[in-house]
């Protein structure tokens, strides 16, 4: 997750490395070294005691092996592009190709033509590892129920959080490592307001339940409350992003992220001073949220505490201690005075403020790695996501074990639940977004290829189930937020 301003570039470089397709082949000669007792540098050095003919043969064999690796790698990339193209053509029919199986089959065929016994063994090993490069395209008919509608591009760095306003006019909010928060028109994708009051990464954004107020948390160790006033522009026809010309496909496939030569946020009004600044933490404030009613706010920090503030006076009401490591997220119940905090200590805690005289805490243990988020649903359930690649559904009345567990192939970031339909949106480190129901049944995976979808890790998801244009939003470290239209009735019918 984000650090303070000095470490934002470091986080970005770290995430960029995840997408590197460079292939580094380390030539080892352990068997030769064991037989001859000579180190590798002597085999390659000028003073090697090996005959020149033997050295030349060795170097030639190494060159052949390297070329075979390179050919396999190129073929794998070509197969991946073919799979993307075929899936887009078949998306309208609700079909998908199992890319993992296709890639393995193709690679097996191509590997069988090897004439060298040694290179054949190495190629088989390489094939097993590189088959993971191709995305897994599991057969599902739900692709037709999920459509990319709008891309919101304007941030200069990764976007950590996305949120939808609860009051009219309904706008989209994004929080970024570029030290700003932006408000967007959902229909047009135009930036309406820029908040530039923080001096560190903006790690979360949440809207007040009844007023035009936003709450942002930052790496500068503060949380800000600021007022906005927006006027929505006239909606323009939404472009169909599912149909892209072949010329555009080649152009887009070479891009790792959106082209941001022009700063679209430079033309929108900028707010630089908050109404209220909440200052009590001694570390990065990673998340913040409004308690029911909007008169109090809670913050979560890397100093291992969560703080409860009075919004009107900015006074600290409670400091919530108990986590053993940095906090990663906090969330409030929509109708009750309950707070849930997540931590790197593999637990999340439920704090109960319904009794003004005393607050109680319950600890949930069940994950084996950082709990990246835990959120409330309607009723007595909490859903938690973790870097251990699982999502767990819990009953607040029974903390001992989850009532459902979802196992995935990638770490999970800030999840969100569609309250009305009880659908969980899972944003992954591996650029995928998957939808599950509360019992753990997978409903869909959002379309993603070299031409659409996220190009780096997806950090957060947010539902807006009543919006006519987009009812799901995601954001990621590719510096863009995306609005999706999820046909929920069709999704549930296919279930």
UniProtKB/Swiss-Prot annotation:
The answer to whether the entry has keyword 4Fe-4S is no
**Region described as Disordered:** 1-50, 237-266
GO BP term, example: lymphocyte homeostasis
Q: Where in the cell is it found?
A: Cytoplasm; Nucleus
| Bias (Acidic residues) | 246-264
Q: Name one GO cellular component term.
A: nucleus
| Segments of skewed composition (Polar residues) | 1-13, 22-31
Q: Where is the composition biased (Basic and acidic residues)?
A: 32-47
**UniProt KW keywords:** Cytoplasm, Nucleus, Repeat, WD repeat
Q: Where are the WD repeats?
A: 154-194, 197-236, 280-319, 322-361, 366-404, 407-446, 453-494
Described function: Required for normal ER Ca2+ handling in lymphocytes. Together with PACS1, it plays an essential role in stabilizing peripheral lymphocyte populations.
- Assembly with partners or alone: Forms homodimers. Interacts with PACS1. Interacts with PACS2.
Q: What is this protein called?
A: WD repeat-containing protein 37
- Which organism does this record belong to? Pongo abelii
């Amino acid at each position: 997750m984000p650090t303070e301003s000095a470490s934002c570039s470091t986080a970005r470089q770290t995430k960029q490395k995840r997408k590197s397709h460079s292939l580094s082949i380390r030539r080892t000669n352990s068997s030769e070294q064991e037989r001859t007792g000579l180190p590798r540098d002597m085999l390659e050095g000028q003073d090697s005691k090996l005959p020149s003919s033997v050295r030349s043969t060795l170097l030639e064999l190494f060159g052949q092996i390297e070329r075979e690796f390179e050919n396999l790698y190129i073929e794998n990339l070509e197969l991946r592009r073919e799979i993307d193209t075929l899936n887009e053509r078949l998306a309208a029919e609700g079909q998908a190709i199992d890319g993992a199986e296709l890639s393995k089959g193709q690679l097996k065929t191509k590997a069988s033509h090897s004439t060298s016994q040694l290179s054949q063994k190495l190629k088989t090993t390489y094939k097993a590892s590189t088959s993971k490069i191709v995305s897994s395209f599991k057969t599902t008919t739900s692709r037709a129920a999920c459509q990319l509608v709008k891309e919101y591009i304007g941030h200069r760095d990764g976007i950590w959080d996305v949120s939808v306003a609860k009051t009219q006019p309904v706008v989209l909010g994004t929080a970024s490592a570029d030290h700003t928060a932006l408000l967007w028109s959902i229909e047009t994708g135009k930036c309406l307001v820029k908040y530039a009051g923080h001096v560190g990464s903006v790690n979360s954004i949440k809207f007040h339940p009844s007023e035009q107020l936003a709450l942002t948390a930052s790496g500068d160790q503060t949380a800000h409350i600021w007022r906005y006033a927006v006027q929505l522009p006239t909606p323009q026809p939404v472009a169909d992003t599912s149909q892209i010309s072949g010329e555009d496909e080649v152009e887009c496939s070479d891009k790792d992220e959106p082209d941001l030569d022009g700063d679209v946020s430079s033309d929108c009004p900028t707010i630089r001073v908050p109404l209220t600044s909440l200052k009590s933490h001694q570390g990065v404030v990673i998340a913040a949220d409004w308690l029911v009613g909007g008169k109090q706010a809670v913050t979560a920090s890397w100093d291992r505490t969560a703080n409860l503030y009075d919004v009107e006076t900015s006074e600290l009401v409670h400091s919530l201690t108990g986590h053993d490591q940095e906090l990663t997220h906090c969330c409030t119940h929509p109708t009750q005075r309950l707070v849930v905090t997540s931590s790197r200590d593999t637990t999340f805690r439920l704090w109960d403020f319904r009794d003004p005289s005393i607050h109680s805490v319950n600890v949930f243990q069940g994950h084996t790695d950082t709990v990246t988020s835990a959120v409330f649903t309607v009723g007595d359930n909490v859903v938690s996501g973790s870097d251990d690649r699982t999502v767990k559904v819990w009953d607040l009345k029974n903390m001992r074990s989850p009532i459902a567990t979802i196992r995935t192939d990638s770490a999970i970031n800030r999840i969100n639940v569609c309250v009305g339909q009880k659908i969980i949106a899972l944003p992954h480190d591996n650029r995928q977004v998957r939808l599950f129901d509360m019992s753990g049944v997978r409903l869909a995976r959002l379309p993603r290829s070299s031409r659409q979808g996220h190009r780096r890790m997806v950090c957060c998801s947010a539902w807006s189930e009543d919006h006519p244009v987009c009812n799901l939003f995601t954001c990621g470290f590719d510096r863009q937020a995306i609005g999706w239209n999820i046909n929920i009735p069709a999704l549930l019918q296919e279930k």
